[in-house]
């Protein structure tokens, strides 16, 4: 007998795991410590040999207890997992009647949560027990019958986070009001093919907007002095939206790698959206995107302020520029302050449609106070100042209505302001409409999503009377389009003929040759043109009258200063007055805009000196041929009158050296050096002096018209 007792002890002692041999023990499970009994016995019906194990297994049924699907659910669970122990080894299991009542009340929630009902707790296996252990029932349930049961199950119990969407503690995740829960990734509203189309669309629009805004900024760099206040904020505004476009393009390239967390099979976690500032890449994208989005809007408001100061308050450009420090402080300081606040509040959210990170994508309060409210405020202030400025400009236009030229310029300026403002305000107001529509319908969309996936995720399905509503993909595409296309309005302001001229000049300067050789080439081409022109006239004109008018063409090559002063001379070319210069010829010989006005004023004084130089040095080929043709027509007897005419004009003409020298030097074009240095950039000025020789029979003198 003693041997048998010893064997039983050896068999059952390892199973007791520290418990007293067949004795009751105090209840340590917190949820069951409020029961009418305080002692329990282990192992229980499910074979648990420790209260800690029983407490862990009991957690699978906690949704039923938390939702109170039955008034006796707590009593039944505690009696099943932590049974009652009376008088040492007398264990009281749950009764069959209690099991049937609880199971019938909670059957729908058991199916909803996918809870596996243990075989040991099947009501058929339990025994009917006496009334020594009271079973509490809800009197309303007994009175109302099955109607009350249906009402209890169908009441709205809120959102329960699915197991694969739960996150580890300490990250600050919150989804649909539930802590440590994250939205699913990819997007919870759209299918995979719709998401691919939306991402391609956003990437294409971002490239187009990036090119447009960069064109505006590069135009500013070509000629910085062109864009002064009040127009200067347009440049900063375009820079901001170029960064915004760049962020969306980077998000398009990255896909979901930054906006989503990868699934963890070990922890049974699925792909979820990044929430909070723990992800560094997502945080950087958020900071740049939100900061420059708000900064671009503030710079537009500052642009309307500068326009109002210039048009309404009649401030000068210099006066407005003095306030530039304050403009920069507000434009960069306000978005920076809002960005820091959002980082401190841990409001960073991944966007699994565009691939970037922003704010207010799942948090309605953050979207309302940090996106919608600032944009509405900027639109209101900017539109008010813009209307005030346009009214002031219209008043000025009425005052100067007698000045047609200035009135036309002012009218064009007002049209530019109106079109530019419309190109900015229409997309921005549309964007605000998208945000407002999303604010109103977001809750309905979320309830619909929970209702569609509750059985798949084994979570409670919401009870609702409203019709289901799902968002349209077109709404989100319009929102992204309006966000990006706002920056394109700056292209309209810089898009003018002057901008094309500046870009053409920029590329031309990059390919420009040596300025000195360039000026010489222009001079040589001009002289060759006159030489060819006069040779044609020589064959056509057989009769020459000495009284015919002549044009004295003086070509002066202006060099370019490249560290040392470059001096170039002048050459004189005589053309008969019969050789009429057409519009194209005048265009070719027209002086450059950089010609010094001092030479034009000193034209009368410099002409005699140039003529003396022309007579004292070898003549140009065109001049020699012109004079030679004149002598052949008039004969040797008229040479004296020509020389007398030359003396009356203040120059000395050689008699016999003209022909010889001209023929000898016909192949050499010599340009005498000018006494006045020039620093103009490769320009060639051609000064045309009409000289009329009116022959008088008696005096043989010459009358000159200059």
From Swiss-Prot:
<dbReference type="Pfam" id="PF01392">
    <property type="entry name" value="Fz"/>
</dbReference>
<dbReference type="GO" id="GO:0016327">
    <property type="term" value="C:apicolateral plasma membrane"/>
</dbReference>
<keyword id="KW-0832">Ubl conjugation</keyword>
<comment type="similarity">
    <text>Belongs to the G-protein coupled receptor Fz/Smo family.</text>
</comment>
<feature type="topological domain" description="Cytoplasmic">
    <location>
        <begin position="223"/>
        <end position="233"/>
    </location>
</feature>
<comment type="function">
    <text>Receptor for Wnt proteins. Most of frizzled receptors are coupled to the beta-catenin canonical signaling pathway, which leads to the activation of disheveled proteins, inhibition of GSK-3 kinase, nuclear accumulation of beta-catenin and activation of Wnt target genes. A second signaling pathway involving PKC and calcium fluxes has been seen for some family members, but it is not yet clear if it represents a distinct pathway or if it can be integrated in the canonical pathway, as PKC seems to be required for Wnt-mediated inactivation of GSK-3 kinase.</text>
</comment>
<feature type="compositionally biased region" description="Basic and acidic residues">
    <location>
        <begin position="646"/>
        <end position="658"/>
    </location>
</feature>
<dbReference type="InterPro" id="IPR020067">
    <property type="entry name" value="Frizzled_dom"/>
</dbReference>
<keyword id="KW-0225">Disease variant</keyword>
<protein>
    <recommendedName>
        <fullName>Frizzled-6</fullName>
    </recommendedName>
</protein>
<dbReference type="GO" id="GO:0030659">
    <property type="term" value="C:cytoplasmic vesicle membrane"/>
</dbReference>
<keyword id="KW-0325">Glycoprotein</keyword>
<feature type="compositionally biased region" description="Polar residues">
    <location>
        <begin position="662"/>
        <end position="672"/>
    </location>
</feature>
<feature type="glycosylation site" description="N-linked (GlcNAc...) asparagine">
    <location>
        <position position="352"/>
    </location>
</feature>
<feature type="domain" description="FZ">
    <location>
        <begin position="19"/>
        <end position="132"/>
    </location>
</feature>
<dbReference type="GO" id="GO:0004930">
    <property type="term" value="F:G protein-coupled receptor activity"/>
</dbReference>
<keyword id="KW-0807">Transducer</keyword>
<feature type="topological domain" description="Extracellular">
    <location>
        <begin position="438"/>
        <end position="473"/>
    </location>
</feature>
<keyword id="KW-0597">Phosphoprotein</keyword>
<keyword id="KW-1015">Disulfide bond</keyword>
<dbReference type="GO" id="GO:0009986">
    <property type="term" value="C:cell surface"/>
</dbReference>
<feature type="disulfide bond">
    <location>
        <begin position="69"/>
        <end position="106"/>
    </location>
</feature>
<dbReference type="GO" id="GO:0005789">
    <property type="term" value="C:endoplasmic reticulum membrane"/>
</dbReference>
<dbReference type="GO" id="GO:0042813">
    <property type="term" value="F:Wnt receptor activity"/>
</dbReference>
<feature type="transmembrane region" description="Helical; Name=5">
    <location>
        <begin position="371"/>
        <end position="391"/>
    </location>
</feature>
<feature type="disulfide bond">
    <location>
        <begin position="32"/>
        <end position="78"/>
    </location>
</feature>
<feature type="topological domain" description="Cytoplasmic">
    <location>
        <begin position="392"/>
        <end position="416"/>
    </location>
</feature>
<dbReference type="GO" id="GO:0031625">
    <property type="term" value="F:ubiquitin protein ligase binding"/>
</dbReference>
<dbReference type="GO" id="GO:0030168">
    <property type="term" value="P:platelet activation"/>
</dbReference>
<dbReference type="GO" id="GO:0005886">
    <property type="term" value="C:plasma membrane"/>
</dbReference>
<dbReference type="GO" id="GO:0005929">
    <property type="term" value="C:cilium"/>
</dbReference>
<dbReference type="InterPro" id="IPR017981">
    <property type="entry name" value="GPCR_2-like_7TM"/>
</dbReference>
<dbReference type="GO" id="GO:0016324">
    <property type="term" value="C:apical plasma membrane"/>
</dbReference>
<keyword id="KW-0217">Developmental protein</keyword>
<dbReference type="Pfam" id="PF01534">
    <property type="entry name" value="Frizzled"/>
</dbReference>
<dbReference type="InterPro" id="IPR000539">
    <property type="entry name" value="Frizzled/Smoothened_7TM"/>
</dbReference>
<feature type="topological domain" description="Cytoplasmic">
    <location>
        <begin position="495"/>
        <end position="706"/>
    </location>
</feature>
<keyword id="KW-0675">Receptor</keyword>
<feature type="transmembrane region" description="Helical; Name=2">
    <location>
        <begin position="234"/>
        <end position="254"/>
    </location>
</feature>
<dbReference type="GO" id="GO:0060071">
    <property type="term" value="P:Wnt signaling pathway, planar cell polarity pathway"/>
</dbReference>
<dbReference type="InterPro" id="IPR036790">
    <property type="entry name" value="Frizzled_dom_sf"/>
</dbReference>
<feature type="topological domain" description="Extracellular">
    <location>
        <begin position="346"/>
        <end position="370"/>
    </location>
</feature>
């Amino acid at each position: 007998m003693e041997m048998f007792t010893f064997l039983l002890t050896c068999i059952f002692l390892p199973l007791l795991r520290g418990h007293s041999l067949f004795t009751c023990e105090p209840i340590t499970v917190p949820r069951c410590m409020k029961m009418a009994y305080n002692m329990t016995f282990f192992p229980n019906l499910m074979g648990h040999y420790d209260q800690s194990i029983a407490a862990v297994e009991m957690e699978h049924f906690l949704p039923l207890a938390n939702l109170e699907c039955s008034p006796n659910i707590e009593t039944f669970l505690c009696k099943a997992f932590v049974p009652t122990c009376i008088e040492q080894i007398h264990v009281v299991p749950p009764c069959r009647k209690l099991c049937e009542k609880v199971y019938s009340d909670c059957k729908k929630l058991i199916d909803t949560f996918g809870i596996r009902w243990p075989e040991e707790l099947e009501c058929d296996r339990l025994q009917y027990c006496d009334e020594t252990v009271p079973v509490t029932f809800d009197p309303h349930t007994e009175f109302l019958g099955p109607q009350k049961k249906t009402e209890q199950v169908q009441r709205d119990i809120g959102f329960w986070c699915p197991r694969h969407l739960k996150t580890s503690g300490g990250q600050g995740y919150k989804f649909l009001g539930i802590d440590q829960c994250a939205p699913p990734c990819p997007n919870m509203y759209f299918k995979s093919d719709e998401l691919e189309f939306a991402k391609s669309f956003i990437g294409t629009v971002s490239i187009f907007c990036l090119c447009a805004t960069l064109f505006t900024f590069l135009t500013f760099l070509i000629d910085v002095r062109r864009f002064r206040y009040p127009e200067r904020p347009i440049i900063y505004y375009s820079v901001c939206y170029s960064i915004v476009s760049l962020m969306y393009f980077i998000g398009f390239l990255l896909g979901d790698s930054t906006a989503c967390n990868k699934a963890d099979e070990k922890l049974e976690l699925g792909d979820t959206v990044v929430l909070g500032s723990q992800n560094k890449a997502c945080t950087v994208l958020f900071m740049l995107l939100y900061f420059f989005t708000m900064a671009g809007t503030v710079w537009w408001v500052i642009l309307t302020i500068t326009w109002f100061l210039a048009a309404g308050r009649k401030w000068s450009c210099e006066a407005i520029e003095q306030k530039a420090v304050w403009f920069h402080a507000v434009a960069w300081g306000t978005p920076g302050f809002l960005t820091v606040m959002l980082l401190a509040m841990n409001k960073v959210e991944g966007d699994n449609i565009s691939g970037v990170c922003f704010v207010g994508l799942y948090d309605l309060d953050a979207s309302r106070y940090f996106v919608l409210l600032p944009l509405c405020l900027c639109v209101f202030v900017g539109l008010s100042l813009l209307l005030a400025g346009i009214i002031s400009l219209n008043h000025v236009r009425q005052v100067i209505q007698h000045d047609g030229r200035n009135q036309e310029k002012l009218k064009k300026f007002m049209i530019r302001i109106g079109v530019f403002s419309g190109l900015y305000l229409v997309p921005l107001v549309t964007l605000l409409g998208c945000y407002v529509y999303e604010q109103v319908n977001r809750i309905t969309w979320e309830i619909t999503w929970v209702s569609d996936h509750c059985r798949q995720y084994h979570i409670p399905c919401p009870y609702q009377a409203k019709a289901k509503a799902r968002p349209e993909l077109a709404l989100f595409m319009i929102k992204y389009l309006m966000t990006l296309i706002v920056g394109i309005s700056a292209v309209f302001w810089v898009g003018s003929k002057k901008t094309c001229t500046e870009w053409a000049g920029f590329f031309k300067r990059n390919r420009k040759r040596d300025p000195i050789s360039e000026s010489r080439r222009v001079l040589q081409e001009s002289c060759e043109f006159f030489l060819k022109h006069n040779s044609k006239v020589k064959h056509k004109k057989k009769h020459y009258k000495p009284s015919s008018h002549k044009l004295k063409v003086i070509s002066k090559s202006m060099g370019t200063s490249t560290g040392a002063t470059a001096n170039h001379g002048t050459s004189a070319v005589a053309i008969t007055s019969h050789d009429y210069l057409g519009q194209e010829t005048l265009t070719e010989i027209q002086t450059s805009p950089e010609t010094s006005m001092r030479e034009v004023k000193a034209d009368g004084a410099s002409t005699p000196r140039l003529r003396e130089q022309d007579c004292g040095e070898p003549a140009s080929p065109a001049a020699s041929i012109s004079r030679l043709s004149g002598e052949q027509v008039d004969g040797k007897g008229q040479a004296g009158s020509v020389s007398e005419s030359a003396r009356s004009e203040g120059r000395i003409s050689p008699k016999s050296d003209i022909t010889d020298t001209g023929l000898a030097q016909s192949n050499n074009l010599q340009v005498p050096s000018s006494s006045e240095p020039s620093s103009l950039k490769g320009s060639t000025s051609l000064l045309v002096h009409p000289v009329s020789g009116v022959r008088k029979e008696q005096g043989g003198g010459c009358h000159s018209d200059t």
